[in-house]
């Protein structure tokens, strides 16, 4: 399979950040390491749950819903960790802020792209509903309208979405953010950067699967290497290896699309074409297509809700960070005035 961009040879150009959490600061580490261990244990568990029970579950809207729901939980988890670390924005180094803002805006762009594609797929649902209505009428004139609607639907499904086409560039730039910034004299900062690394890896891989499914191109699929020192590394590699191997086989098939529920509708449409052309439809033969259309529509709605949830979590995190930065700036100005008391306000994530 093609890769959007080979990841850097080493994700840690400034040295191994994991060894920085050493016993030199044993008193502080004894408080911080349980927080990190708990976060990474939960991360490993959430990643393990993404391994499909059956190969047929890969590239389904149900898996996509589960994956996006899992991302929401993980990103809420990092917000909780920041609060538990008692690491106010006033203690953040500028480069941490830059990294957070840069990554979050790219992820928001991906969310917008995924939402636009889900909306586009839902627009195709209207064509299917109109076609089914005419197929049930089962008259020559109605069957002609039905075939026209189904032809339009097929063209709609295979058409390109510019926002999805742009995902490859966004994913490639996100790969570069896997390099961890150097942290000086802040054990809390080291814990945060290590935790963020796990969040970024999970988010990047899942986003790549979404982009591959929506674009029909394996070039968006990620191949990431992670350190064996990480407690979630084995779970992640299992998910990646299992998913990538089967997705490769799916892309080698001759289906209209790679998304399972979407392909089920396309297959149902194809089976009805001979009867449409003959001018007569057995009402019973319509039921499988009706069921497939309903399953696809319901699934898309559920995935859309989870993507929207993820978008709101990202946006909330950015807004809170920016609000705290503005508050810090205001406090600095107030501190220079003899009429105002000095101090910095902090609101947790």
Curated annotation (Swiss-Prot):
The keyword Transmembrane helix does not apply. InterPro entries: BPS1_pln. Residues 1-43 form a transit peptide. It is found in: Plastid, Chloroplast. Keywords: Chloroplast, Plastid, Transit peptide. It comes from the Eukaryota. GO terms for biological process: embryo development ending in seed dormancy; root development; shoot system development. Its main location: plastid. It holds the Pfam family BPS1. One of its GO terms (cellular component) is chloroplast. Expressed in roots, hypocotyls, cotyledons, leaves, flowers and siliques. The keyword Plastid applies. PANTHER family: BPS1-LIKE PROTEIN. Required for normal root and shoot development. Prevents constitutive production of a root mobile carotenoid-derived signaling compound that is capable of arresting shoot and leaf development. The mobile signal produced in absence of BPS1 is neither abscisic acid nor the MAX-dependent hormone. This is Protein BPS1, chloroplastic. It comes from Arabidopsis thaliana (Mouse-ear cress).
